[in-house]
Amino acid sequence: MWQIVFFTLSCDLVLAAAYNNFRKSMDSIGKKQYQVQHGSCSYTFLLPEMDNCRSSSSPYVSNAVQRDAPLEYDDSVQRLQVLENIMENNTQWLMKLENYIQDNMKKEMVEIQQNAVQNQTAVMIEIGTNLLNQTAEQTRKLTDVEAQVLNQTTRLELQLLEHSLSTNKLEKQILDQTSEINKLQDKNSFLEKKVLAMEDKHIIQLQSIKEEKDQLQVLVSKQNSIIEELEKKIVTATVNNSVLQKQQHDLMETVNNLLTMMSTSNSAKDPTVAKEEQISFRDCAEVFKSGHTTNGIYTLTFPNSTEEIKAYCDMEAGGGGWTIIQRREDGSVDFQRTWKEYKVGFGNPSGEYWLGNEFVSQLTNQQRYVLKIHLKDWEGNEAYSLYEHFYLSSEELNYRIHLKGLTGTAGKISSISQPGNDFSTKDGDNDKCICKCSQMLTGGWWFDACGPSNLNGMYYPQRQNTNKFNGIKWYYWKGSGYSLKATTMMIRPADF
């Protein structure tokens, strides 16, 4: 189509150029043939000669000045007529030329149009095919893109839904946390008020304690001065006591000598008395059975030996016949003793004393004995533990204790660890602890790994007897930090 339009414009330009050349040729008088060349087209025009026109060399011209006015006018009219004829002839020739060109151009235009249409159709078909291919490719790409966009959109929608659910969950959690924070803030405010009140109370108490401390310091100062005076008096009393003890010792020797003399004289007079004195007792049960039913100190004899020992016999408790092997009541005797002292015994049988491990070991290995432990606290309460079978091993086995059959009110569990433990002292460590329990807890005892009991510990007076790990303790009655007021360990034959 564009080629046809271009050809039409080209031919119009050719005709216009031919017309312009024709006008130029008309201006040149004397030329009878005119030729127009435009591209591959060549046009030749033959025009008639102008016979009626005069040349400028006419004799009338040289005399034109001398002619009258009517002659000049007629000449002009004639010339105009000639020109009109010429113009009419030219017009006719141009019309013929135009008709000729139109007739010739129609055929050429038809051929050109047919060729152009064929060429253009092929081009258009090719272009259309390319466009269809491109359109199909673009459509396929658009379909892929659309699918990708759809998948991406779906994924984004799912993510958006997840984010929305997560956001809702977070909002709920935030609301819950906000509620918890508000509760905590309220509780914190309450606690702050309580702390402030406690601080005020604490300040008041500190002031009161400070005042009491000042008062106590004054009292301590006074007591220190009193103690110094008492120490001076004690030193004086000690000196006097030493003198009195010496005097008492001399008196005792004198009394013993007198008693010996009296016994000798009585023996000479009454032979039955000498026979009674030769009778010996193994334990207080034999003393009780012999008719002596009064509490007191009696002389006992080691089994299979003539060696004697002083012991206190309880002839009233539980039917009597009890041999006291340990007693604590006032802290007058120090129980932080050596192995040898615990072996042979120490103290005063009428007060605090330890009978001796060697005698108890030999005695309890002769026959079956029971052990009763009687306890008192500082509040006036009493309790006991009774073991149906008791004996001590020999010194070679560190006087190991053996107990069976516990009854009593001082705890359902034995405060003396079982099986039997070896005896330990400050110079004979036989316990199961690397800490040396006898040195740490004081006193000699059957320690395990320091164990739940120690009746030979440090004696503490009332109001100082709590929270004492090294006191006189029996764990399963009063706990580990309570130091008892009094204890008694006594034995008696099981068949008494």
From Swiss-Prot:
What residues does Ca(2+) bind to?
Answer: 429, 431, 433, 435
Coiled coil spans: 166-248
What NCBIfam families has UniProt attached to this entry? GGGWT_bact
Q: Where in the cell is it found?
A: Secreted
Relay the domain remarks: The Fibrinogen C-terminal domain mediates interaction with the TEK/TIE2 receptor.
**What keywords sit in the KW lines?**
Angiogenesis, Calcium, Coiled coil, Developmental protein, Differentiation, Disease variant, Disulfide bond, Glycoprotein, Metal-binding, Secreted, Signal
Q: Which residues form the signal peptide?
A: 1-18
Role this protein plays: Binds to TEK/TIE2, competing for the ANGPT1 binding site, and modulating ANGPT1 signaling. Can induce tyrosine phosphorylation of TEK/TIE2 in the absence of ANGPT1. In the absence of angiogenic inducers, such as VEGF, ANGPT2-mediated loosening of cell-matrix contacts may induce endothelial cell apoptosis with consequent vascular regression. In concert with VEGF, it may facilitate endothelial cell migration and proliferation, thus serving as a permissive angiogenic signal. Involved in the regulation of lymphangiogenesis.
Return the protein name.
Answer: Angiopoietin-2
**What assembly does the database describe for this protein?**
Interacts with TEK/TIE2, competing for the same binding site as ANGPT1. Interacts with ITGA5. Interacts with SVEP1/polydom. Interacts with THBD; this interaction significantly inhibits the generation of activated PC and TAFIa/CPB2 by the thrombin/thrombomodulin complex.
Variant or mutagenesis effect after changing residue 492 to Q: In LMPHM10; uncertain significance; no effect on protein abundance; severely decreased secretion
Tell whether Transferase is among the UniProt keywords: no
> PANTHER family this protein is in?
FIBRINOGEN ALPHA CHAIN
Q: Which residues are glycosylated?
A: 89, 119, 133, 151, 240, 304
According to its UniProt entry, this protein's organism is Homo sapiens
Which Pfam family is an annotated match for this chain, by its short name? ANG-1
Q: Which cysteines are joined by disulfide bonds?
A: 284-313, 433-435, 437-450
Q: Per its UniProt record, which disorder involves this protein?
A: Lymphatic malformation 10: A form of primary lymphedema, a disease characterized by swelling of body parts due to developmental anomalies and functional defects of the lymphatic system. Patients with lymphedema may suffer from recurrent local infections. LMPHM10 is an autosomal dominant form characterized by the onset of swelling in the lower extremities within the first year of life. Lymphedema may also occur in the neck, upper extremities, and scrotum or labia majora. Gradual resorption generally occurs, although some patients may experience progression complicated by cellulitis.
Coarsely, its chief localization is: secreted
Q: Which GO MF terms are attached to this record?
A: metal ion binding; receptor ligand activity; receptor tyrosine kinase binding; signaling receptor binding
Q: Name one GO cellular component term.
A: extracellular space
Q: Which gene encodes it?
A: ANGPT2
Task: Provide the GO biological process annotations.
Answer: angiogenesis; animal organ regeneration; blood coagulation; cellular response to growth factor stimulus; gene expression; germ cell development; glomerulus vasculature development; maternal process involved in female pregnancy
- Every copy of the Fibrinogen C-terminal domain together lies at 275-495
